[in-house]
Amino acid sequence: MINVTFLAHSGFLVDDGKRCYVFDYYKDPNNIVWQLAKRGRELWFFVSHVHADHFNPSITEFDGPQTRYICHQDVPLEGKVKKCITMRPGHDATLDDVSIHMYGSTDEGGSFYVKTNTANIDSDSIFHAGDLNWWHWLGDTPENNADAKRMAWREFKELDGLSVDVAMFPVDNRLEDAMEWGAIEFLRRVEVKKVFIPMHLNGPLWTPSVYFKALFGDVPVWEPQKEGDECTF
């Protein structure tokens, strides 16, 4: 069983009962992470890249014996906290009983695949996309959008055959009619067993299109309605 709490924007807290994985902490208006820190919970912060809506330097305030930081190599945290590792796309890390792989991005940084217990084949796996997406902007030039598609296909190809329990992926309103394109291509390649969670909305809540539902009607989707919402899977 795994509990997921939406912090804000692309920020999530995933609690597997043993430790709490905090992805792309940007803000936490409900002070959920602080409450867990005060209770002595083990906190692992994952930072996909340096954009201000994915990385808040204040996460150093959580540093302590129960805290780890796993960051893309461009995130300036090394030397500022006690336990920090940096990664780049294509690299693996094993910390305690947790295995981590950093996949690529179509913007800055990378994306994270986390297996929560390497000793248990049935343990939960988590994918957080960071800014990995098909960034097709309707007002952009054909050349730029062709480049965006090539970049997306290159990174999505690395995900072919991946199976995850929980996936968090951008569905950005600013892309207008193209807002689902990245999610659709992601789900064509990746099996999501427990839940697909849209993030990075930059606008109203997402209503899956008829086309999306026709393709992936069997994929469980949870869309948080507000900051602080949580669900157990």
Language-model features: locations:
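Active-site neighborhood of phospho(di)ester-bond hydrolases with catalytic His/Asp-centered motifs
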Residues: 22-26, 41-55, 70-74, 127-131, ...
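Metallo-beta-lactamase
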Residues: 67-123, 218-233
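Active-site HxH/HxHxD metal-binding segment of metal-dependent hydrolases
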Residues: 32-93
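Pre-active-site segment of Zn-dependent metallo-hydrolases
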Residues: 11-50, 57-61, 132-161
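Binuclear metal-ion centers of metallo-dependent hydrolases, dominated by the metallo-beta-lactamase
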Residues: 4-10, 80-95, 158, 179-233
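Active-site-proximal loop/helix segments of hydrolase catalytic cores
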Residues: 108-189
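Active-site environment of divalent metal-dependent phosphoester hydrolases
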Residues: 28-31, 50-55, 75-79, 91-93, ...
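Active-site-proximal beta-strand elements of phosphoester/diester hydrolases
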Residues: 3-6, 21-24, 98-105, 123-131, ...
